[in-house]
Amino acid sequence: MASNSTPKYNSNSLENSLRRSPGDGMNHEQNDEIPCLPGEALITDKDVIYMCPFYGPVKGRIHVTNYKLYFKGEEMEPLISFSVPLGVIARIEKMGGASSRGENSYGLDITCKDMRNLRFALKQEVHSRKQIFEDLTKYAFPLSHGLLLFAFQNEEKFPENGWAVYDAMTEFRRQGLPNGQWRITFINKNYELCDTYPPLLVVPYSASEEDLKKVAAFRSRNRIPVLSWLHPENQSAIMRCSQPLVGMSGKRNKDDERYLDIIRDTNGQTSKLTIYDARPNVNAVANKATGGGYESEDAYPNAELVFLDIHNIHVMRESLKKLKDIVYPNVEESHWLSSLESTHWLEHIKLVLTGAIQVADKVASGKSSVVVHCSDGWDRTAQLTSLAMLMLDSYYRTIVGFEVLVQKEWISFGHKFSSRIGHGDKNHADADRSPIFLQFIDCVWQMSKQFPTAFEFNEHFLITVLDHLYSCRFGTFLYNCENIRDKEKVREKTQSLWSLISSEKSKYTNPFYTKELNRVLYPVASMRHLELWVNYYIRWNPRIRQQQPNPVEQRYMELLALRDDYVRRLEELQITNSPKMNSSTTSPSSPSQIMPQVHTPF
């Protein structure tokens, strides 16, 4: 049975996980030696030698379940043990062959999606590699073997339903929609207009359903410009869409041109609509050869086009590979800065943040509606709109608000999580894989470092989100769009990650958070102010980990607990003295006359 205690996910450094039994806090059922989730079953186990890059060879036993790989060491004090959700595994390779003669040269190499690699050596004479290789491959890549992802087998129960966090109509109403300029359309309720958009869309009030269909025919994958966010005061809008289908011949579409004019007119405060094309100019021009393109000045005289120079998914994938090479397993101190620079990872983070700042500033200060797109409108577009909304709207900086932001801008609007992450798929070399959502979370972390009191959630929250981006324990990030999720009945058959978060919110809460309404955040996106997220990218290396937990945060939490204890004792004293107050014939002028003073440090 699942316990009522909140599941936790271990995101501490490798040293912490190595030097103790796995206290990852999940809803555990004991299965002899290994901790299991409800619905998790042991598949196989074998004696192995873990080739630890930090402590050397460790004898132990590997256990494979339908959810995770679990290693438990032997003959070593303290105990070395760790677990890896199978969804985190990107590739499994055989190491060595029948002719291998070196010690520990025969076994398995496992490449993970979370910046670590694992190597296990086995004895050749036992012939145990074949079975464990086949079992690992089968359950790490279930979709490639006709099996269900673990999320559909997970039997965990939580006190709160995370699927209820986001309701499109509720979020629209929070933004003051519909109103005289904007309406909610049900044209996509059966995914007939655009199969990768959500069922409910917000469009200009004066645009008819027929107009929307004509515009869809001129936008890549029918992803028309629709509203993401509306400024509560100046009524400027953030719109998102895909590229226009201009092609080499420079095709035009009067309906699309008129539609963008209608968007410009909705707030009536600027003479031009700003279109932010996330791509480098040269890439946008090159896309004409495949039927795409961009909005030319001739066709859209009332629009200003700005290219943001953010590179495509392939460049980002290669950049992350280079970053992994320099952070795992060893960090070379003597060339660290030049090595980090050569990955270009922070440069890409800078460009994404810079683009989002431009979008936010144009809406808030320029009082202009904006249209944001890349090629298909589900990668760089999602990064820009969600980050700009995070800067503009303090609601999205709360825990629930951030969950709504992710559900809305990423999940409902069709970021291809399945393709970008490769859930349950053995094709590790798939060109569609790319760390787009990781970049977004990295940008959020950069903002939280610059504004430490502005976000209700803490770093542990962000790491937990990334861990379960890969784990396949929850249904939240599965599949490419809502259309497919509905067909697979994800909400009915799986648990939401937000259920886990809601179950013990205090673990994910920033103790320094100060609620501020209507404060716009403009982070500094220069290279001097950006940092490598060590607690995520290098967390598996015990030699280069930051102090855990943060001593200032820990002390603050202790003071908060002390304050809560004082408040509790004060309430108990009030209850104890209540009968005396009621029976007294003379009413004291203040509670202090009948109650002992309780002094707190606050």
Curated annotation (Swiss-Prot):
Disordered, as annotated region: 1-32, 574-602
One GO CC term on file: plasma membrane
Biased composition annotated in UniProt, kind: Basic and acidic residues: 17-31
Ranges where the GRAM domain occurs: 28-96
Residues that, per the record, bind a 1,2-diacyl-sn-glycero-3-phospho-(1D-myo-inositol-3-phosphate): N287, N312, I313, S375, D376, G377, W378, D379, R380, R420
Keyword Membrane attributed: yes
Keyword Lyase included in the entry's annotation: no
Enzyme active site: C374
EC number(s) reported in the record: 3.1.3.95
Membrane topology: Peripheral membrane protein
Listed CDD domains: PTP-MTM1 (cd14591)
Main location: cytoplasm
Listed Low complexity bias regions: 583-592
Keywords: Cell membrane, Cell projection, Cytoplasm, Endosome, Hydrolase, Lipid metabolism, Membrane, Protein phosphatase
Domain of life: Eukaryota
UniProt-annotated binding residues for a 1,2-diacyl-sn-glycero-3-phospho-(1D-myo-inositol-3,5-bisphosphate): N287, N312, I313, S375, D376, G377, W378, D379, R380, K416, R420
Gene Ontology terms, MF aspect: phosphatidylinositol-3,5-bisphosphate 3-phosphatase activity; phosphatidylinositol-3-phosphate phosphatase activity; phosphoprotein phosphatase activity
Family from the record: Belongs to the protein-tyrosine phosphatase family. Non-receptor class myotubularin subfamily.
Record comment regarding domains: The GRAM domain mediates binding to PI(3,5)P2 and, with lower affinity, to other phosphoinositides.
Protein name per UniProt: Myotubularin
Organism of derivation: Xenopus tropicalis (Western clawed frog)
